[in-house]
Amino acid sequence: MASSLRAAISKIKRDDVGQQVCPNYVMLRSSVTTKVVRNVVEYQIRTGGFFSCLAMLRPLQYAKRERLLGQRNLERISTRDILQTRDLHSLCMPTPDAPMSNHQASTMRELICSYFKVDHADGLKYIPMDERYSPSSLARLFTMGMAGLHITTEPSYKRVPIMHLAADLDCMTLALPYMITLDGDTVVPVAPTLSAEQLLDDGLKGLACMDISYGCEVDANSRPAGDQSMDSSRCINELYCEETAEAICVLKTCLVLNCMQFKLEMDDLAHNAAELDKIQMMIPFSERVFRMASSFATIDAQCFRFCVMMKDKNLKIDMRETTRLWTRSASDDSVATSSLSISLDRGRWVAADASDARLLVFPIRV
């Protein structure tokens, strides 16, 4: 499996509709397999999605410098390859993999400027106001996680040049959206063992249970991609320190929120009896799951910002309610949750507990 994925990196240049794929990005053919064990149907979705396998998290300054100098010594690069908060901006570099509206561009740009404390000129550079682009890396970070969740604990899979979460199915909740079970004639999702709230409560510890690997693209043409990624593969947790804690926490929080939203979509599909009333429908269902995983858009920047600010204020809210807030706010003047009342006053979000306003979030400028 690992060798076939590596071989596919340099061969596949076009997507399913024949459009040219950006050379720095990888389109791997999907492979959806199912396995039934004790009435539990497990889906394994093997795909690279649309993301850069080797250049996902490379610090921009080092990558550009080494490319100009023709540097080939990976050890020298790794000694200086320290992830700084500002380097996380590389996650937001646009790619032509999906369209993005001007509103989405401006909200994502404002989020980056606000959270990483940069001016708007830098924000415009990282996220141009152009509908041809998408905030690909933050958006596709979710796709990357979903593509890697099927990876087993078998050591050979750990080195596949795909960014992945540590998929120990005994402790990794986020793998469970791919698990459903049969209750008579009804298809129901398997209940998670660890909630996303617990993952988010990790504070600035970098969510140590989540292992995101990345590679540094240095010698792209003269060495096989597989060998190169084996040499330069890194784990983001290795880079965790006091200076990088905030950036890594933001990165992983975004991933957790996306995975939770995906699980909600999975639950909706799994409870659709008309579509899944027979076991023969499992294969089309898995194909639909793959399509969702490979094309899922980024969470709304305002919703993400709201969630982060609530976390900073130590306000608790059910994750299912959190991920539904933004879509409902488009039509409702207020959203009542189990613990808070969210009201919308001329675009402002006000979270109130009883009669006290606990959090006020102004809308991101458009």
UniProtKB/Swiss-Prot annotation:
Keywords: Host cytoplasm, RNA-binding. This is Protein sigma-NS. It comes from Reovirus type 3 (strain Dearing) (T3D). Homooligomer; in presence of RNA. Interacts with protein mu-NS; this interaction allows the localization of sigma-NS to the viral factories. Interacts with host G3BP1 (via C-terminus); this interaction induces the relocalization of G3BP1 and other SG proteins to the viral factories periphery. There is a strain variablity in the inhibition of the host integrated stress response (ISR). There is a correlation with the abilities of the strains to prevent upstream PKR activation and EIF2S1/eIF2-alpha phosphorylation. The keyword RNA-binding applies. Protein that binds to ssRNA and participates with protein mu-NS in forming the matrix of viral factories, which are large inclusions in the host cytoplasm where replication intermediates are assembled and viral RNA replication takes place. Plays a role in the inhibition of the integrated stress response (ISR) to escape from host cell translational shutoff. Participates in the disruption of stress granules (SG) through its association with host G3BP1 and mu-NS. The keyword RNA-binding applies. GO terms for molecular function: RNA-directed RNA polymerase activity; single-stranded RNA binding. It is found in: Host cytoplasm. It comes from the Viruses. It holds the Pfam family PolyG_pol. GO terms for cellular component: host cell cytoplasm. Residues 1-11 are annotated as: Important for ssRNA-binding and formation of complexes.
